[in-house]
Curated annotation (Swiss-Prot):
ValRS has two distinct active sites: one for aminoacylation and one for editing. The misactivated threonine is translocated from the active site to the editing site. Keywords: Aminoacyl-tRNA synthetase, ATP-binding, Coiled coil, Cytoplasm, Ligase, Nucleotide-binding, Protein biosynthesis. It comes from Mesomycoplasma hyopneumoniae (strain J / ATCC 25934 / NCTC 10110). This is Valine--tRNA ligase. It is an enzyme of class 6 (ligase). GO terms for cellular component: cytosol.
Amino acid sequence: MKNKYDFKLVEEKRNEKWQKKGFFIAPKQTKKPFSIISPPPNVTGQLHLGHSWNAFIQDSLVRYHKLQGFDVLLLPSVDHAGIATQVKVEEDLAKKGIKKSDLKREEFIKKCYHWKEKQYLKIKEQWDKLGICYDFSKERFTLDQDAQIAVSDFFIKLWEKNLIYRGQKAINWDIKLQTAISNIEVINKPVEQKMYYLKYFLENSNEFLTVATTRIETISSDVALAINPKDKRYLHLVGKKVVHPLTKKLIIIIADSNVSSDFGSGIMKVSAHSILDFEIMEKHNLESKDCIDNYGNLNHEVPEFQGQNRFFARDLIAKKLEKEGFLAKIETVISNVGFSQRSDEIVEILKKPQWFVKMDELAKSLISHLNSKDKIKFYPKNFEKNLRKWFEKIHDWTISRQLWWGHRIPVWCKNDEFKVQIDSPGQGWIQDEDVLDTWFSSGISAFAFLGWPQNFDLIKSYFPTSLLVTGWDILFFWVARMYFSSLFIMKQKPFEKVLLHGLIRDEIGRKMSKSLGNGLDPMEIIEKYGSDTLRQALIFNSSPGKDIKFNIEKLNTAWNLNNKIWNIAKYIADLDTFFAKPDLIDLWMENKIYILKRQIVKNIKKYNFSVIGTEINNFIYGDFSSRYIELIKTRKNGFYARKLLRKVLIILHPFLPFLTDFLMEKIFKMEILEQKMPRIRQFKENQKVENILEIIDNLRTYREKFQISKKIILEYCIINDKFSNAEIDIINKLTFGKWLENKELVIKTKNFEIAIKVPEELKKEQKGRELKEIQFLKSEILRAEKILTNKGFLEKAPREKIDLERTKLEKLKEKLVFYEKK
């Protein structure tokens, strides 16, 4: 073995070996399963640190359970990522001078599949470097043939239960991507903008009402003014009419409980392009009129501004209203604006025909399950409350997307008639042009990836899956949808437990992103430090629900631990191996291994990986390296030490798979993944070994404190206890000491009194230091006496300061007497 840990030597082709040997191919039938369906990364780019963290957690848990005797399944998959992939492919085509509109739908889809294959190969290479134990015989793609059958079947089953409908409703519209998006794909951000205070004159009156709005561009779609029915200031105006500032038409004043009396003047203009406004219009039977088109431009409702960009038109409309006396004032405010998570474009609210999932019944089913004993266990627990709150206020889900790449909606149209089925009903029937929301297809992955609705072999063995590991940021996007979809189709929960981790941030707490330039490529880290080092740096700083502040120091710490394990293994491997029974030191060490294993088992159940990391670090640096290895240096036989090392390697394997596999193969000529988690005997705490260690620690501390060279033999004895010659021999060898009866200098430790004969060299040094101290004390006494005999000081200084100087002088004199007596 090399003198220094070389991760490239250790990790080279190791995952390839695991795959070839089929260590992680899950049997179709099992009585003791542990299964995880891995969150599918998008086929739009490379894996980032967050993907690596997630994959490492899953992999470590699967390896741990395999060593515990479970049949394990870690199922890999990738997501077609509808909007994101289509954008990437369009950008790629644009570089070649090709527009999407230049291609037929089938041609564009082929381009998308080609992109997917190219990207998937990159992702698989990255998984290989990470060392993830996927069962590639069962890999899935959210748009593969089986997935298409499953998604269509799911849609049809929802339709048959009247849980899917097509309706003309206010939806979130991404004007850049030209598609509808769901509510949770809208991200609110604080934006500085203008608040316009508009005058609405009462019919046949010089009196006016002031209405505050940030969206002056929607004024042409105003159909009413609304006040809160509890607002006494305006209640007498309900039913009256006001003059529209722009069109000069009359619009009515209504009362609605959704109006906030605290916002602006407490009067709200009811117009298109707001979900709340649409709800009020429906309730009061008011006709809605869009004034903004699909591209974010003003339409024909106001010919004067037709074709103008919605935001540019704000100033034009404001100037016109100011000129005509309808603008009271303008203020600058900070308010939340909805942005598309996909394109980062400001979302527009448009009324459009779309496909929706009715969520009331599905939400009630999920909440009911959360109230049962069979509910999914969330780690940390507070995310269950978050999920419950979200479902208590949920809206219907917009599932249609105006894209080409994705699952086609299984609906066929002919004139005004439509049919919901997978295959075409016949001649003249045209399939709906839209595709389904990506989360609609990934929302059934918990059971569809296991074969539903065509093959139930894996479902019988591995469903519900044991665990889902994912980031808390997709709790509502993905976890929630798998939950209610599984309850609807399978009549049971999709997984037993959900472990939610946080986000990876930089060392000052910022989210890693391309725009900030603070992102780190996991493959570059692996190239420099190795996969095991990156795994450690992420997993051993991981707690449920918590973010990680990542920095290079974490990598250095992890690499040092790997190097320490390497050095321990190399030392033990070089020892003689003739048979020998374990001595007290070996049994003491075995007990320490038992304690380590117990701590890992305890904390892995709670997914407290940071605690496991601390326990492993303390064990390796403390018990194994500084204690056990030091103690066995007094002998040359490593027969039992090798047995202990083998157990430690198996215990550490889930967290350091490459290194432990290499060492097991190199030293023991065995495959670590063919082993079982070792049974370790528990012994009573071996007090004799603890006593030896206590003496060694204190003698070493004494030597370090006074910087006594190892060339000088430290003479000592234990006053209040007896040690055997063999025990004294161990202490002597590890402290460069010698037993000598004396009572010169007595050190009291936790359990002992150690008498040390002070070396002559130290006495000389100590005498020199004492003489210097005496000289210093005399000069300080002289200074203090001079101050206290100074009349000016005594007359002007505060009493407290004078008393302080006198106290100081007394202490200096006492100290001088002490040193002069010595």
